[in-house]
Amino acid sequence: MSAPAGKAGPKAQKKCKVVTQKTKTVPKKTKQQKPRKVRLQKVERQVKTLKAKTRGPKISDTFSTVVTVGRIIGNNDDSLTRQLKVFVNPLLMKNQDSGSTSSPLSIRASQYGLWKIAKLHVYFTPLAGSANVIGTVSFASLEQESGVATAESPDTIKAKYHAEVPIGSRFVWKVPPRMLTGPREGWWNMDSGDDPTNSVGPSISFWTYLKTILALSTATTTSYLGSLFLIEIRCTYLFSNYAPKPNLAIMVNEKITTTQPVTLTNLSDGSLVMTTTDTRLCALLDNDRGPRGPNAQTNGPGEKFWAVSTLVVDTVAASIGPWGWLLKGGWWVIRKIFGAANTTSTYAIYASVEDAAKDSRIYQPVSGTQTLAAGDVYVTQLTQPNVNEAGSTSLGFSPPTPPAPTGSYLPLPQAAGVPGIPPQYTFSDGQYTAATTWSGTQLYLTGVPATKTVSGSNEMFGVENNTMSRANIDRVQIYDFTTTGIIFLGGQNRSGGAIHTAKTLIVALKTATTKAPWLAADATGTNWAMPSWVGFPVPGAGDHFLQMQNSTDRTTHTTPVGVYFLVAYGATNKLVAFWAAPTDVQAEPTSLMTLYNVDAGRAPITAGLNFTTAMTEYSDDDDDAESDISSLFAPDEVDWKFKIEASSSRHLEEELQFWKSKATQLMLEKN
C-alpha cells in the first residue's frame, strides 16, 4: 500500500551481508586397499594348505580300467535272488570266475597299502530283449558295510543307494565317489587280512526279483534261466603308501557248479557248520591246508576267510530258525575247520568278516538233515595269510592245486582219503582225470592180506551180472586187504603207479561222482548171494565190487569158481576178496599176491597186461635255457645280469624256474 501525498513513507530496512569463512578440510589418510584378486589368491592358498593337512596321504599312483564282472541270469521263481556280490576293494574287483588268476588291477593294487576310488560306473549290457523275456526286474545296490550279512528284501534294497533296471535296457549307473570314501581321510587299507573292517570296503550286489518268463511260449509258462545282462565296471583307483605284497594279486574269485550237495549240521559244541564232499569245492576251499608236516595245522579254524554266495537257499532257511535270514540273503563267510572227519570237509559259518576274524560262530541247532541242492556257488577269498611267497604270482591260468591228504601218509596204512578223488584216475598237470570205462585190466591189487578159510553147507555164492552166474559153494577163502592193500594203475596206464590204499579207495568210492570201473552191489540186474556161514553181509546199498583174477590167470570165468570177488563194504570200511574153493583151498602164496580186474563174466583183456614199464631215456636240457631269463629284461638294462651255473641239466632246470619267478616278481614291482 503506498503512502499518502505529502507524507514520508516507512524507513527502508538496512540489508546486512553475512560473510562466512570457508574452512579447509584435510582428508584423513586411509589404508590402501589390496586388489580383490590378491585377496582371492591368498584365500585359495590358505584353503590349499588346509586341504593338504586333512586329505590324508599323497597320491602315488592312478589306475583306470574296465572290469568284466559277470552276468545276471534269469530267476526260477518269484523270490529275491542275489546274483552277484562284487567287492570294491581293487584286489577283489575282478571277474567272478577268474579263479586265482591275477588281473591288471590286482597286480597294481598289490604294490600299495592304501586305496580309494575316483570314479565307478556300472554298465548293464542287455543280453535278452524285453519283447521275448518278461517278468523280472534287476537291482543293483551299494552296501557300505560289505563284510556283514543282512536280511534283504526289495524294500531294504530300495532304501539304499540303488539302481533298478528292467529287462532289455542298456543302463549306466554312476556311483558318486563320496559314497565310497574310506575311514582314513577317504582311504582304505589294502590288505584285508590286517583289519577287515577298514580294508574290505563297500560292495555292489546284483539282484533279480520275480520269475523270469520266456514270452515266446504262449501255451505254457516257461521259465527263462539264460543270460539277462552282462555287467561291466569302469573305474579309476588312487593308490598310496608303496608296500608290495605280490600274493594279494592272486586271491581267488571263482564260480563252481557243485555236483554234490552241501549239508548243514552242528559240531559237538553246537556251532553251525556246513559239510560237503564235492570234489571241486573241497579242492578250492581246502587248498590252504598244504602238505602234512610237523608244523602243519591239524585242528581249529583255518587262516583263510571265504565269502560264499549261492542262489539255492530258500528251501532250507527255515531249518536254522532265527538265523534263516542269513541263508535267504545268499551270502555268508566261512572258515575251514581242521580236525573234523576225513571223509568230508567241514566249514564254520559266520555272519560277518569281523565275526570270522574273532571266530564268533553261530550256535543254532539244525532240525534234521538239511542240504543245499547242488548248483552254482560263487567263492571269494577275503584274506591271504602269506602275502610275499616267492614266485606265486600268476599271470595266466593255473590249474587248481590237488588236495593234499589229511593225516600221516607213512606208513601207508595210516593214510586218510581225500574226499572227491576218483577211485580210478590218471594224474597229470595237477589234475585228476577219472576213468570212464568199466573194462578190465584197469587196476592191479597187491598186498599182504589177512586170510582164513570158512566152510558150511552148500549155499549160493556169487553174483548174477553180465554173463556171470552164481553157484552152490560149501567153502570160501577170505582175503582181507583192508590194512595192507595197495591199488596200482594197470594195463596201458600202469606207469602211473600206486593210486590208492584200501582206506583211501573206500573214501573215494563214498565221495566221488564217477566210480568206474567199480560196480554198485545194488545196481539193477545185479543179484548177490553170500553164504550165511561166511561171516560177512551180502553186498548191497553203499557197497561196490570187482571181479579179480590172479595175475597168471588169463582164462574166462562165468561162475564164481576160480575168481576173486573183491568187495568194498561202505558201512564197515573194509576191502575183502572172496575166493570160492569147492574142491580144494589155494596154497599159501610164495610171492606177493597180485590180482587184476576183469569185467564180470567176460573175457580178460590181455593187451597191456604186463607188470613192467619201459625205461625213459633222459636227454640234456636245451643249452639256451638261460636266454629265457634274459629275455624278461629290457635290452638297455645292462645292470641286470644273471649267471646260472649248474652241475647238471636237472639242476639247471630247477634254478631256471626259481629265477624266472623272481624276475617276474621284480618286474611287477618295478612297474
From Swiss-Prot:
Protein name as annotated: Capsid polyprotein VP90
Signal peptide, first to last residue: none
Compositional bias per record (Low complexity), positions renumbered to this chain: 1-11
UniProt modification remark: Specific enzymatic cleavages by the host yield mature proteins.
Entry superkingdom: Viruses
GO biological process, one term: symbiont-mediated suppression of host complement activation
Keyword annotations: Capsid protein, Host-virus interaction, Inhibition of host complement factors by virus, T=1 icosahedral capsid protein, Viral immunoevasion, Virion
Protein's UniProt keywords contain Transport: no
Pfam family, one: Astro_capsid_N
Primary localization: virion
Annotated segments matching region P2 globular domains: 407-609
Keyword Heme applies: no
GO CC field: T=1 icosahedral viral capsid
Family, as annotated: Belongs to the astroviridae capsid polyprotein family.
Biased composition (Basic residues): 25-39
Region (Disordered) location: 1-39
